[in-house]
Amino acid sequence: SDAIASLAGSWRGVDDARAHDLYREAFEVDPTDYYPLLNYVDGEIERTGSTGVLDILAPMASQAMARCRAHVDVGVNIPWSLSSLAKFHLLLGDPYAALEWYALAIRSANSPDAIPSLERTRAAATQIDGHGWCDRMLQMARIARFPEETATGEAGRTPTEGAPSIEGPVLIVAGSTDPRLAERIEGYRPLVAAAMAGFEGTVISGGTRQGVCGMVGEIAATGARARTIGYLPADLPANAEPDDRYDELRSTDGTGFSPLDPLQNWIDLIASGIDPSDVVVLGIGGGQIAATEYRIALALGARVGVVEGSGREASRLLADARWTDAPGLVPLPADPYTVRAFVANPPQSLGSVEREALARQLHEAYRGEIAATRSEDPAQRPWETLADDLKQSNLNQVDDIVGKLAEIGVDY
């Protein structure tokens, strides 16, 4: 089947009908070969504008998905095996799982061409649950991950109409809004307050009065320095109340709460020229939408701090072996001071020379305090030979000190 599928690929764009027939021939030879199977399904949907072919896909999908998953587990054909597994989940009616696998594919991509497109299935997009979510995410991710190699494509034309650009840095507060968990989530209010205390930039959340989103609105009303933006669907469920304490509420075109809300905030961020590395996410519990939000942020290169013990999707992410090695994922204790340090803005008015000079002084003071121990501890080395991560630790201490001074009005 590999040889036939390769031949089919050579006909793509030259004689698509010939390519389509060859893809069918290839998967008939080996029904477990996911590459020709998915290409045949894409071609049928593109040709007919309907999803009738999925009746054929469903019975044979399990073996092809098992082979695809086996490739993922041993790191074969990455990111294509990841995106193929995502496509199976999408076509078989599990869009939330599809989003998670697509996020892994986005994270693994080393070029814009390695991020898949759903162009061939758009003819039947309204017949495939969650197709719009996945399509929008992939278009946005291609630009966000590879801004210098991609033109401002369709994702660049879909920011919130008439909305001003978002100013960085950006803090996204995500997590539980389930009223049944209100009492438990209330215990995390000090963490949200600590995250927003002194934060200067833009804070984004869900824009309702429920759960962590409502905490953002309430804290904003007390005079927070940051500008707050809430994203919520135009067709808001009856049990959800918009929070007018936000500085701005932006509507998405979703029906009820969906991944379109966090996707739209990322589309707006990218359209505003915000680098994902300048975005910090604070995650507290949450359901399926939060699970998507955490993984999209990690895939794009944001820092995601997830509060340990907050349950549900936050806990599942921290236990997910596919994500635990993500550079941006940081497990956070339920401690306000740690959360504040995690989201803190680096002091902008302190020059790099002054910042390093203060860090050197802190390090020398530390060396002086422990000089009598004559330890071989690498942390006792002179600044010039100190490991980079230990230098960064001293620089972070400087940032924290300067930030605390700024909070009490001390001009540095």
Task: Go through each PLM region and give its residues.
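Alpha-helical propensity feature that highlights long, continuous alpha-helices across diverse contexts
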Residues: 327-412
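Terminal, low-structured helical/coil segments at or just beyond the last alpha-helical repeat
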Residues: 117-147
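Alpha-helical repeat scaffolds
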Residues: 17-25, 51-71, 96-107, 133-145
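Acidic/glycine-enriched connector segments
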Residues: 1-39, 43-48, 54, 58, ...
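"A position-specific structural signal for the A-helix of alpha-solenoid helical repeats
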Residues: 6, 39, 84, 88-91, ...
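Canonical tetratricopeptide repeat
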Residues: 4, 37, 82, 115-116
